A protein has these predicted regions:
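Juxta-kinase regulatory segment immediately upstream of eukaryotic protein kinase catalytic domains
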Residues: 2-39
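ATP-binding pocket architecture of kinase catalytic cores
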Residues: 40-162
């Protein structure tokens, strides 16, 4: 699909003051924990979302997505980025289309909060369920793809994959 589906909550922006990341610490950590990780060329914050700050991390040849707990005092059970990472990493063992989970970091000294890193998957966020800018044929293809993905997800043996 082309960009006609992008809305006001799509894309990236400069990282907000509240969500700044220590790029030097992050670079050092990723160099030590990911084989052949390149120099970070940019970090941007995704627009939209409700809970965990999410960033687009670019290197010269690859893009990644970093999700972290927000800064500040949090409820112990809230913002479970460890659970998000475990689910995505487990689904990497299936045919459910999810990003590649690279690593999970509990060490808050790296960027101030726990985080995980995954591949960046290009696509469109469909904020309106009826997809008003889509033609009937486009809408049909989108719904069919969504239904196929949900069916794959429901067929996963969660005990087998962890």
């Amino acid at each position: 699909m082309d960009s006609k589906f992008k809305g006001e909550y799509s894309g990236t922006k400069s990282v907000s003051e509240r969500h700044l990341i220590d790029q030097v610490n992050l670079q050092t950590y990723l160099n030590e924990n990911l084989e052949s990780f390149e120099e970070i060329s940019s970090i941007e914050e995704f627009i939209g979302g409700q809970s965990n700050p999410t960033y687009l991390i670019k290197t010269p040849s690859k893009s990644y997505v970093l999700r972290r707990k927000p800064p500040g005092k949090l409820l112990k059970s809230a913002h479970a980025v460890d659970r998000e990472y475990k689910v995505i990493a487990a689904l990497n063992k299936t045919d459910v289309p999810v990003p590649k989970a690279y690593l999970h970091c509990e060490d808050e000294s790296i960027i101030g909060t726990e985080f995980f890193l995954m591949s960046c998957v290009e696509g469109e966020v469909m904020w309106e369920p009826h997809i008003p800018k889509a033609t009937n044929e486009e809408r049909k293809k989108i719904y069919q793809s969504m239904n196929e993905t949900i069916a794959k997800l429901h067929s996963v043996d969660h005990e087998k994959i962890g």
